[in-house]
Design a protein with these regions (language model features):
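Gly/Ser/Thr-rich phosphate-binding loop
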Residues: 275, 295-303, 314-375, 388, ...
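Conserved AMP-binding/adenylation subdomain of ANL enzymes
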Residues: 231-250, 260-299, 310, 314-317
């Protein structure tokens, strides 16, 4: 689409373009914040504060240590650490050493870990001690030469660290004996000084990150992301919040940092504006998360709908035991944000919860609802500054479509990745040349429509279309209908094999605590709101649904389980 109907609907103070973008590496934001706000907290973890001056120094020393271990510009270095100060130290240390960050999901299975180690070719990885044995088991047959190991107690306040060592370290698997060749991170930091940091001229087009996709469609692929991509998206997100106060904000860092969303919209954004990061290593521990909100009064809280919904329904929150009024702005991503979740959370906090959209191939945001302006129900919002979008026909993949027509979202912008690591065929199908010779277009695989104001709406994933008896059925539409049922807490919908229709619709439901729901009630609810061919023919009630670490329901896992059960009969 040549015009940009969304521009008139931007909030006051949000520019149409940020060009020209600064030509600096991502870690320059940390150095700038350390110069502007040296004594401001950078991370807060269980009461232990690391200031921006200290974080800059620690990451310099980490860079020196990595260089001394043989890390050269362009080398991939792994991180296998939850949301703790060590992640921030290591992340910026790798970048300052000229390395490429490869952040691994701590919940990955050994098979997934081995795949990522082999695919990325990393030779060194920094790992939290309680995950050490898992990496050692995955190490044989990979290029991984040595591990740098950190202990969670290293960044706890002294008394807490002592108690942790006495009462929990062995019990919870944090105490380990290192194999020959592996090293303690704390020893390396003590051994090196910031002055030893390698003197490198890291360029914007240098690779900063191999961001592996969440693996919702199979083994993950590594998206090659440059410093320029990450710097641009950090600034795009900053521009979207013109009321943000430099050097004063506090970010609740509950979304995983190994995920592009947490890494950019959480950490990189916060560091760029001198915000404090309140580190939450396990967001499923709602008591700990709520205690952090109560104590440290965060103003920014990037998250996912399942997390906001869990807070809304927590009995202590309902009883008014926690003060959530400090929260001003929350960008929700990774899954659809239901209106009920949004309204309840905004009533609890007095802040604004608004939905955005992004992907690992454009880390991390390309669209967002406005902070001040109208948020439209079911919409992912408008393109961020400098993001161009087209909606292309599902029939030929070429013909541009207009307002409220449904097709594949295709986009380009300064945050778009450079391709998949060692996967030229997948790169060529995802990044396609522009007929006019401009920057290539990213084919997202998401089916969308755009309204007359330039707000976009996700219809579904192209690959998850259900073809039932010749009809096209989008799972998300059915999920939204079922999620609106007052007794339904979570829902997943997918196509399963059917001898007569080819595929048929199945729904998996989690019922709210204390409620009961029957299959007949579910079908009656859908029958009033959906065409007959869209109504689920099979219903399964479950206590929980399989999800990615950022709360996205794994439809393919539900289908796999269904097929296994069917085959066993």
């Amino acid at each position: 689409m040549e015009s940009k109907p969304w521009l008139p609907h931007y909030d006051d103070g949000v520019p149409a373009s940020l060009a020209p973008y600064p030509t600096k590496p991502l870690h320059a934001f940390l150095e700038e914040s350390a110069a502007k706000y040296p004594d401001r907290p950078c991370t807060i973890f269980k009461g232990r504060v690391i200031t921006y001056r200290e974080m800059n120094d620690l990451s310099d020393r980490m860079a020196a240590a990595l260089a001394a271990q043989g890390v050269k510009p362009g080398d991939r270095v792994g991180i296998f650490i939850p949301n703790t100060p060590q992640f921030v130290i290591v992340f910026y240390g790798i970048l300052k050493a000229g390395g490429v960050v490869v952040a691994t999901n701590p919940l990955y299975s050994p098979r997934e870990i081995t795949h990522q180690l082999k695919d990325s070719g990393i030779e060194r990885m920094v790992v939290m001690s309680n995950f050490y044995q898992r990496i050692k088991e995955a190490q044989p047959g990979t290029q991984l030469k040595s591990l740098i190991v950190t202990k969670i107690k290293e960044q706890l306040p002294p008394v807490l660290g002592l108690l942790f060592g006495l009462l929990r370290e062995k019990k919870e698997g944090h105490y380990v004996e290192l194999a020959a060749g592996d090293l303690w991170m704390q020893d390396l930091l003590a051994r090196h000084t910031a002055a030893e940091r390698p003197k490198l001229d890291v360029q914007p087009d240098d690779v900063a990150l191999l961001q592996y996709s969440g693996g919702t469609t199979g083994l993950s692929k590594g998206a090659v992301v440059t410093h320029a991509c990450l710097t641009a998206n950090t600034l795009q997100i900053r521009s979207w919040l013109p009321g943000m106060r430099e050097g004063q904000e506090v970010t609740l860092m509950a979304i995983p940092l190994f995920h592009a969303y947490g890494m950019v919209a959480g950490m990189a954004f916060a560091v760029s504006c001198g915000a404090a990061l309140v580190m939450v290593p396990n967001p499923r521990d709602l008591h700990d998360l709520l205690e952090n909100i109560n104590k440290y009064r965060p103003t920014l809280f990037p998250g996912v709908p399942t997390l906001y919904n869990a807070i809304n329904n927590h009995p202590d929150v309902k009883a008014g035991k926690y003060n959530l009024s400090s929260i001003r702005a929350c960008i929700s991503g990774s899954a659809p944000l239901l209106l009920e979740t949004k309204n309840t959370f905004e009533k609890l906090t007095g802040g604004k919860l608004f939905e955005g959209y992004g992907l690992s191939e454009a880390p991390t945001a390309t669209h967002c609802n406005p902070f001040q302006g109208p948020n439209k129900e079911g919409s992912i919002g408008m393109p961020l500054p400098d993001v161009e979008c087209k909606i292309l026909s599902l029939e030929d993949g070429v013909t541009p479509l207009g307002v409220n027509e449904i097709g594949e979202l295709v986009l380009r912008g300064p945050q778009v990745f450079r391709g998949y690591w060692n996967m030229p065929a997948e790169t060529n199908s995802t990044l396609q040349a522009d007929a006019a010779g401009g920057a290539p277009w990213l084919f997202t695989g998401d089916i969308v429509r755009m309204d007359e104001d330039g707000y976009f709406y996700i219809v579904d994933r192209k690959k998850e279309l259900i073809k039932a008896g010749g009809f096209q059925v989008w799972p998300r539409e059915i999920e939204e209908v079922l999620a609106a049922h007052p007794k339904v807490m979570e829902v997943g919908v997918a196509g399963i094999p059917d001898a007569y229709r080819g595929e048929t619709v199945k729904a998996w439901l989690v019922v709210r605590p204390g409620e009961t729901l029957t299959e007949a009630e579910v079908k009656a609810w859908c029958g009033d709101k959906l065409a007959k061919f869209k109504v689920p023919t099979q219903i399964e009630f479950r206590s929980e649904l399989p999800k990615t670490t950022v709360g996205k329901i794994l439809r393919r896992e539900l289908v796999r389980e269904h097929k296994e059960k069917a085959a066993a009969k």
